[in-house]
Amino acid sequence: MEPVSTITGKAVVLPVENIDTDQIIPARFLKVTDRSGLAAGLFEAWRYQADGTPNPDFPLNRPEAAGATILISGRNFGCGSSREHAPWALQDYGFKAVLAPSFADIFRSNSLKIGLLPVTIDQAVYDELVARYAADPQMHLTIDLATQTVTLPDGRQVHFPIDAFSKYCLLHGVDQLGFLLQQEEAIIAYEASHPQPVTTR
Protein backbone atom coordinates (compact mmCIF):
# COMPACT_ATOMS: atom_id res chain seq x y z
CA MET A 1 0.00 0.00 0.00
CA GLU A 2 1.32 3.43 -0.94
CA PRO A 3 1.65 5.98 1.90
CA VAL A 4 -1.04 8.64 2.04
CA SER A 5 0.02 12.06 3.27
CA THR A 6 -1.24 15.02 1.24
CA ILE A 7 -3.75 14.73 -1.58
CA THR A 8 -4.14 17.72 -3.88
CA GLY A 9 -6.34 17.29 -6.89
CA LYS A 10 -9.38 18.07 -8.93
CA ALA A 11 -12.72 17.22 -7.36
CA VAL A 12 -15.90 15.95 -8.95
CA VAL A 13 -19.31 16.07 -7.28
CA LEU A 14 -21.84 13.25 -7.43
CA PRO A 15 -24.72 14.84 -5.48
CA VAL A 16 -26.61 11.68 -4.54
CA GLU A 17 -27.38 10.37 -1.06
CA ASN A 18 -27.39 6.73 0.03
CA ILE A 19 -25.26 5.45 -2.83
CA ASP A 20 -24.96 1.73 -2.15
CA THR A 21 -22.18 -0.64 -3.10
CA ASP A 22 -24.26 -2.22 -5.88
CA GLN A 23 -24.55 1.20 -7.50
CA ILE A 24 -20.82 1.75 -7.05
CA ILE A 25 -20.05 -1.57 -8.75
CA PRO A 26 -22.70 -4.12 -9.86
CA ALA A 27 -22.60 -7.68 -8.58
CA ARG A 28 -21.52 -9.20 -11.89
CA PHE A 29 -18.11 -7.59 -11.48
CA LEU A 30 -17.48 -9.31 -8.15
CA LYS A 31 -16.16 -12.59 -9.54
CA VAL A 32 -12.66 -11.21 -9.95
CA THR A 33 -10.05 -11.04 -7.18
CA ASP A 34 -7.68 -8.76 -9.11
CA ARG A 35 -8.33 -5.09 -8.46
CA SER A 36 -7.02 -3.89 -11.82
CA GLY A 37 -9.73 -3.34 -14.39
CA LEU A 38 -12.52 -2.78 -11.88
CA ALA A 39 -12.74 0.86 -12.97
CA ALA A 40 -14.74 -0.37 -15.96
CA GLY A 41 -17.58 -1.33 -13.65
CA LEU A 42 -17.58 1.80 -11.50
CA PHE A 43 -21.08 3.34 -11.49
CA GLU A 44 -21.66 1.24 -14.62
CA ALA A 45 -25.46 1.56 -14.58
CA TRP A 46 -25.17 5.35 -14.43
CA ARG A 47 -22.11 5.91 -16.62
CA TYR A 48 -23.54 4.09 -19.62
CA GLN A 49 -26.83 4.20 -21.50
CA ALA A 50 -28.84 1.15 -22.54
CA ASP A 51 -26.97 0.91 -25.84
CA GLY A 52 -23.61 0.88 -24.06
CA THR A 53 -22.59 4.41 -24.98
CA PRO A 54 -21.43 6.82 -22.25
CA ASN A 55 -24.16 8.84 -20.57
CA PRO A 56 -23.17 12.46 -21.26
CA ASP A 57 -25.20 13.72 -18.31
CA PHE A 58 -23.41 11.61 -15.70
CA PRO A 59 -20.96 13.80 -13.72
CA LEU A 60 -17.95 11.51 -14.20
CA ASN A 61 -18.45 11.51 -17.97
CA ARG A 62 -18.35 15.27 -18.37
CA PRO A 63 -15.13 16.70 -19.84
CA GLU A 64 -14.45 18.83 -16.77
CA ALA A 65 -14.33 15.69 -14.59
CA ALA A 66 -11.36 14.22 -16.46
CA GLY A 67 -8.47 13.51 -14.12
CA ALA A 68 -10.46 14.02 -10.92
CA THR A 69 -8.89 12.31 -7.91
CA ILE A 70 -11.34 13.44 -5.22
CA LEU A 71 -14.99 12.36 -5.23
CA ILE A 72 -17.57 14.36 -3.29
CA SER A 73 -20.91 12.70 -2.66
CA GLY A 74 -23.94 12.66 -0.39
CA ARG A 75 -24.45 11.17 3.04
CA ASN A 76 -24.41 7.45 3.82
CA PHE A 77 -22.02 6.75 0.96
CA GLY A 78 -21.20 3.07 0.45
CA CYS A 79 -24.23 1.60 2.20
CA GLY A 80 -25.57 -1.84 1.33
CA SER A 81 -23.52 -5.02 1.13
CA SER A 82 -19.97 -5.28 2.43
CA ARG A 83 -18.29 -5.86 -0.93
CA GLU A 84 -14.67 -4.72 -0.85
CA HIS A 85 -14.78 -4.35 -4.63
CA ALA A 86 -16.51 -0.97 -4.17
CA PRO A 87 -13.47 0.88 -2.81
CA TRP A 88 -11.26 -1.16 -5.16
CA ALA A 89 -13.22 0.16 -8.16
CA LEU A 90 -13.05 3.76 -6.94
CA GLN A 91 -9.31 3.49 -6.42
CA ASP A 92 -8.76 1.77 -9.76
CA TYR A 93 -10.65 4.62 -11.45
CA GLY A 94 -8.15 7.06 -10.00
CA PHE A 95 -9.83 8.38 -6.87
CA LYS A 96 -7.59 8.87 -3.86
CA ALA A 97 -10.24 10.20 -1.49
CA VAL A 98 -14.01 10.39 -1.07
CA LEU A 99 -15.66 13.25 0.82
CA ALA A 100 -19.16 12.82 2.22
CA PRO A 101 -21.22 13.86 5.25
CA SER A 102 -21.25 10.21 6.36
CA PHE A 103 -20.16 6.74 5.25
CA ALA A 104 -21.42 3.23 5.81
CA ASP A 105 -19.16 1.70 8.46
CA ILE A 106 -18.04 -1.33 6.44
CA PHE A 107 -17.30 0.74 3.34
CA ARG A 108 -15.26 3.13 5.44
CA SER A 109 -13.31 0.26 6.98
CA ASN A 110 -12.66 -1.41 3.62
CA SER A 111 -11.49 1.89 2.14
CA LEU A 112 -9.02 2.59 4.92
CA LYS A 113 -7.52 -0.88 4.51
CA ILE A 114 -6.52 -0.21 0.88
CA GLY A 115 -5.44 3.42 1.16
CA LEU A 116 -8.59 5.09 -0.18
CA LEU A 117 -9.20 7.98 2.22
CA PRO A 118 -12.83 8.45 3.37
CA VAL A 119 -13.18 12.02 4.64
CA THR A 120 -16.24 12.88 6.71
CA ILE A 121 -17.31 16.51 6.33
CA ASP A 122 -20.15 18.51 7.84
CA GLN A 123 -23.35 18.72 5.83
CA ALA A 124 -22.88 22.49 5.56
CA VAL A 125 -19.41 22.01 4.07
CA TYR A 126 -20.79 19.44 1.64
CA ASP A 127 -23.55 21.83 0.55
CA GLU A 128 -20.98 24.58 0.05
CA LEU A 129 -18.75 22.34 -2.08
CA VAL A 130 -21.70 21.29 -4.24
CA ALA A 131 -22.50 24.96 -4.88
CA ARG A 132 -18.86 25.85 -5.53
CA TYR A 133 -18.48 22.98 -7.98
CA ALA A 134 -21.55 24.13 -9.90
CA ALA A 135 -19.86 27.51 -10.32
CA ASP A 136 -16.37 26.13 -10.94
CA PRO A 137 -16.16 22.53 -12.18
CA GLN A 138 -12.35 22.80 -12.13
CA MET A 139 -12.43 23.03 -8.34
CA HIS A 140 -9.36 21.68 -6.56
CA LEU A 141 -8.98 20.65 -2.93
CA THR A 142 -6.07 19.72 -0.67
CA ILE A 143 -6.41 17.03 1.97
CA ASP A 144 -3.68 16.84 4.63
CA LEU A 145 -3.86 13.59 6.58
CA ALA A 146 -1.22 14.60 9.13
CA THR A 147 -3.24 17.62 10.25
CA GLN A 148 -6.58 16.01 9.34
CA THR A 149 -7.68 19.03 7.36
CA VAL A 150 -9.29 19.78 4.02
CA THR A 151 -8.30 23.08 2.43
CA LEU A 152 -11.27 24.56 0.59
CA PRO A 153 -10.99 26.67 -2.59
CA ASP A 154 -11.15 29.90 -0.57
CA GLY A 155 -8.26 28.81 1.66
CA ARG A 156 -10.30 27.89 4.71
CA GLN A 157 -9.48 24.62 6.40
CA VAL A 158 -11.97 22.17 7.89
CA HIS A 159 -11.06 19.33 10.21
CA PHE A 160 -12.03 15.70 9.67
CA PRO A 161 -11.89 12.75 12.09
CA ILE A 162 -9.90 9.54 11.69
CA ASP A 163 -8.84 6.95 14.24
CA ALA A 164 -5.17 6.89 15.26
CA PHE A 165 -4.47 3.35 14.00
CA SER A 166 -5.86 3.98 10.51
CA LYS A 167 -4.02 7.29 10.34
CA TYR A 168 -0.72 5.62 11.23
CA CYS A 169 -1.20 2.86 8.66
CA LEU A 170 -2.08 5.33 5.90
CA LEU A 171 0.80 7.68 6.65
CA HIS A 172 3.29 4.80 6.70
CA GLY A 173 1.79 2.84 3.81
CA VAL A 174 1.18 -0.34 5.77
CA ASP A 175 -1.91 -2.50 6.06
CA GLN A 176 -2.94 -4.38 9.21
CA LEU A 177 -0.64 -7.31 8.45
CA GLY A 178 2.21 -4.97 7.67
CA PHE A 179 1.70 -3.21 11.00
CA LEU A 180 1.76 -6.56 12.81
CA LEU A 181 5.01 -7.54 11.08
CA GLN A 182 6.54 -4.25 12.21
CA GLN A 183 6.00 -5.42 15.77
CA GLU A 184 7.58 -8.85 15.18
CA GLU A 185 10.68 -8.29 17.32
CA ALA A 186 8.63 -6.93 20.22
CA ILE A 187 6.22 -9.87 19.97
CA ILE A 188 9.08 -12.40 19.95
CA ALA A 189 10.70 -10.68 22.93
CA TYR A 190 7.43 -10.67 24.84
CA GLU A 191 6.78 -14.34 24.14
CA ALA A 192 10.33 -15.23 25.20
CA SER A 193 9.90 -13.43 28.52
CA HIS A 194 6.51 -15.01 29.20
CA PRO A 195 7.01 -18.77 28.82
CA GLN A 196 3.81 -20.74 28.70
CA PRO A 197 3.37 -23.72 31.03
CA VAL A 198 3.49 -27.07 29.29
CA THR A 199 0.87 -29.67 30.11
CA THR A 200 0.88 -33.31 29.01
CA ARG A 201 -2.82 -33.79 29.56
UniProtKB/Swiss-Prot annotation:
Stored CDD domains: IPMI_Swivel (cd01577)
InterPro entries: 3-IsopropMal_deHydase_ssu, Aconitase/3IPM_dehydase_swvl, AconitaseA/IPMdHydase_ssu_swvl, IPMI_Swivel, LeuD
Pathway membership: Amino-acid biosynthesis; L-leucine biosynthesis; L-leucine from 3-methyl-2-oxobutanoate: step 2/4
EC top class named in words: lyase
Disulfide bonds listed in the record: none
Domain of life, per lineage: Bacteria
This protein's record includes keyword Transport: no
Catalytically driven reaction(s): (2R,3S)-3-isopropylmalate = (2S)-2-isopropylmalate
A GO CC term attached to the entry: 3-isopropylmalate dehydratase complex
Gene3D superfamilies: Aconitase, domain 4
Annotated keywords: Amino-acid biosynthesis, Branched-chain amino acid biosynthesis, Leucine biosynthesis, Lyase
One Gene Ontology term of the molecular function aspect: 3-isopropylmalate dehydratase activity
Enzyme Commission number(s) from the entry: 4.2.1.33
One of the GO biological process terms: L-leucine biosynthetic process
Described purpose of this protein according to its UniProt entry: Catalyzes the isomerization between 2-isopropylmalate and 3-isopropylmalate, via the formation of 2-isopropylmaleate.
Subunit structure, interactors included: Heterodimer of LeuC and LeuD.
Family, similarity comment: Belongs to the LeuD family. LeuD type 1 subfamily.
Record-given protein name: 3-isopropylmalate dehydratase small subunit
Natural source organism: Chloroflexus aurantiacus (strain ATCC 29366 / DSM 635 / J-10-fl)
